[in-house]
């Protein structure tokens, strides 16, 4: 049987590439989206309202969770709250949906985006996942988000956080923001 993935954040730069690569390799990829789609493999969810179409989880082996408000916007007090809540709440909605499934029907793995913004800005040190995080807004967001993510281990899932750095690429990421300055 072909492995099946569920992706959140599939409309973003990283998510769309992951979806494309998995599909090219013959994997079935379901996508959770907050916007309706005619694609039969796209399912609706609304983390703010604790809503998730449970059909999205049917026969899923691995969830790749990339959803969250972009950090590439002005950080007003209100938007900082959205950055944090979008990550915590979407992760919580996923975990609660998974926990409602019979144990033998739960995904085996949860891969979540995280960020290197956890670590202090020190050009003379190489950090590992064993190093403590820094201070500041991003470090706080990442600490709270990863705490929420790792609660899914209690569901018998393998959990992995990918601490991603700055992403450069055509058609997205920070490169589009920086190019006008050059």
Can you say where each PLM-predicted feature lies in the sequence?
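Conserved glycine-rich Rossmann-like NAD(P)H-binding loop of the short-chain dehydrogenase/reductase
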Residues: 27-34
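NAD(P)H-binding glycine-rich loop region in Rossmannoid oxidoreductase-like domains
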Residues: 37, 44-91
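Active-site Tyr-X1-5-Lys
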Residues: 135-159
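SDR active-site strand-loop-helix element
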Residues: 8, 32, 63-67, 110-116, ...
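NAD(P)-dependent short-chain dehydrogenase/reductase
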Residues: 153-160, 165-182
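Glycine-rich NAD(P)-binding loop of the Rossmann-fold in SDR/ketoreductase-type enzymes
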Residues: 82-90, 133-136, 140, 144
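Conserved Rossmann-fold NAD(P)-dependent oxidoreductase catalytic core, especially the SDR/UDP-sugar
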Residues: 92-136
